[in-house]
Each structure stands twice: as C-alpha cells, then as structure tokens.
Amino acid sequence: MRLLFMATLGQTLHEVTLGLDLAAQLKDAGIDAHFVVDRYNKGQLDAAGHPYTLVDTSMGPGVREVVAGAVRRARPDAIVLSDYMAHWLTHVVNYRTDPWFVDDFGPPVIPIDSVNLENTGLELELLGRPTLVSDRILTAPAHLLPVPANRPDATGGRGLPYRAARTPAPPSEAARKELRRSLGVRDGERLLMLPTLPWQRIMQTQAGPLTRELAVRVPRLVGRYLRRLPSHTRFLAVGPYLEGFGLPEDRLRVEESYTAERYASLLGASDAVLALFLPSFALERAVLADVPGLFTVNTFDVDGEPGLRLLSDAFGGVSPAVRSWLAAFPGPVPPFHMWPLRWNAVVSRLLEANPLTTTALRAELLDEESVVAGLEAVLYDPGVRDRLAGARADYRDAITGLPETVEVFLTAARRCGVTV
C-alpha cells in the first residue's frame, strides 16, 4: 500500500511528526509513504528518509497543482491528512483555497484528528472571530485519534484511537548528563523547558487586537512567575524566546531552531516542562519521555472589578502582580486554553475525563501562587514528582493496551474505502 501524507502547516513540528510517527509504525507492514510538507519541515523529511514534495504559502491556490504532481508521482492508495484541523486551517487561511481539493485526485482520504472534533465540537477562534471548522469530519467513515493527546478509551464515534508513537528509549544517564552539561546545567540544578512556537511570536505583531495583546502581555506575567523560582533553576527556551519573559541571562539557554531529534533530546534532558498552551506537543511527548510538567489555562472572563472579585473568591486572593497586569490590559481578559488563541470549546472538552491531565499539574494562569508553587513542585518535590511519574506510567500502560497501530490503520482504511 502507498500513502500520501498531507502535512502542509508550517512553523511547527507537530503535524509532520504525527505523520512520520504513523508512517514509521506502518513501514514494517510494507506500507510506503510520500509526504507533502512545508519547506520549514524539510529537515524532518531528510532525516526520516521518506520521499517528499515541498510547498510554501507563497504558492497560494497554486498549491493544488503541486500536490497533483505529488499524487501522480506517488500513486497513493489513500491520502492521509496529518492532521484534519491543521489541513483545513492552513489551506483556508494561508493558501486561500478549498481544502477539499484533495478529493479531486480519487484516492480515499483518511484524516488524523488530534483533538477528536467529533466529540469536542467544531468552534474555534480564527483571525479574531468565532469560526466553525469544516464539518466533513462528522461524516468521514473513519478517522484516526492519536494517543496522546486523545483519550485511549475514546468511543462513541467514528474515531479510532491509536498509539501516536512508539515509546522512545530513554537516553543513557551518561548521555543525559553530558547534554545537561553542554546546556550549562550544574549538579544540583534543575532545568525547566519552556516551549514556544514561531507563530506565537508572529502574533505579537500580526493578529487581531485581543490576540495580539495576549501574545505580548502573557510572557510578561509568566516571566514574573519564573523569576520567583529558586536561584538554582535554569531555563531552556525551546523555540522563539519571547521578549516579555525577561529571564536572567546567566540561567537561560535558548534553542530557537532545532531538529525533531534535538527537540526530543532537550525534552529528555529537562527536569520539567511548562506548557502555556494546549494541545502541547511538549506535554504529550513528556509522557513518553517520562518528564513531569505543568500546564496553564485561563478559565475566567475578567472584566473590571467584578472579574477581580471572581478571581479572588476562586483563588483566595489576587496577587499584586496579577492585579497590576490586569489593570494594564486594554479591556477584558477572555478565557483561553491555546494561548494566545482561545479555542476554549475544543480544548476544554478534549481535557474532560482525559487521563493525560493526570500526568501533569494544572494551574490557572492568573493564580500566581498556584503556578509558582506548582512549578516548584514538579521541579523539586519528590512526592509530587513520584505521583506524576505513576500517572505517566499508567497512561503509557493504557497506550500499550491499544491494538497494534497497523491493525487500527487498516481498519480505518477499509472503512474509508481502501482495498486492503
């Protein structure tokens, strides 16, 4: 069987990694893959060894012809969307074309759905406005639900949970120690990974007013929290280092560009990871790499004094730094899960009864004491670290209990009309 993977969203590794990890698990069954990816991801494909076709947003609607050429060369039995929402989003916004031109090529389309849209809903924020993702996923004969971040026991629809990746072998203690040494981490120090993405920096200047303000101002608040951590905490910024963080230079290492392999190594060398947005590739891979984490959300709509009273009642008080931050914010602060975007409906439902949330601590971003205490706990508290390690082990056991990925994929392929 031959597959064409569509993974054209640029400025991120996540979607291409989803496709590559699936292709790696299918390769032993004699299933070949050809990828269509953004130029940003060329290095990933070179390392993986799959044939590929490069695209970029300057092509606009002309991307259709480039993909048509890839289809002619690869002669796929099916087209895999890696993933559904990213495919829809990048073609609507960046390529200004109908995402479903892929139907014109003939082979059945099999979507990967990283957030289980069938059960989480289709509403999200796009360019500052509420938008509905294409509902095609609701009538697809089958789609694939990667775990993590989906629930291993996700049922009640056409989605089929599968292992997103093989659990990587942990680095040897000697290799981990050498990498930490190269990052400037001394014995007795802790390393906190702080992942960001290029599009988050872009949104500091090129987004709707509210999204732009969140993109600029949240790092200032987070930087305040991080500077309160013990002085033997070091910071590893993976991705663009956003100016507002203001972290001490003598304890900061920035890795703005990296390969997928380097990213995995950096994660494995860290003592904990902080996720400011969900879904979080770092948090998902931290489960497999056995690294604890903390993720933040804001579930409060904060508008003036009534909003402050709401926060105070919920948190037992509001810190002076948060009060000052809110006072300087130009208008109400909305709830958000995927900072600096909101995406509340989709992400909040993805988290419901999801055992992934037990593998890391959760904190409300505007609760300063909760965030700081949580970060200190995941970095330094043996009891908390052991509890989270147990939850990660349970989650990995649940992943191991899933059917073999080849079996799941072939089931989806048959339902979508592929002759197997």
Where are the model-predicted features located?
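Conserved nucleotide-sugar phosphate-binding/catalytic loop shared by glycosyltransferases and other
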Residues: 5-10, 25-75
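A short, glycine/small-residue-rich beta-strand->loop->alpha-helix junction that serves as a flexible
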Residues: 6-20, 87-89, 200-210
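Conserved catalytic-core segment of nucleotide-activated headgroup transferases in glycan assembly
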Residues: 22, 164-244
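Donor nucleotide-activated moiety binding/catalytic core segment of transferases
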Residues: 63-66, 238-289, 293-294, 299
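Short N-terminal targeting/anchoring amphipathic segment
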Residues: 70-91, 271-276
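Active-site-proximal region of nucleotide-activated glycan assembly enzymes
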Residues: 101-171, 317-328
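Catalytic binding pocket for nucleotide-activated donors in carbohydrate/polymer assembly enzymes
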Residues: 281-387, 395
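C-terminal alpha-helical cap of glycosyltransferases
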Residues: 367-380, 398-420
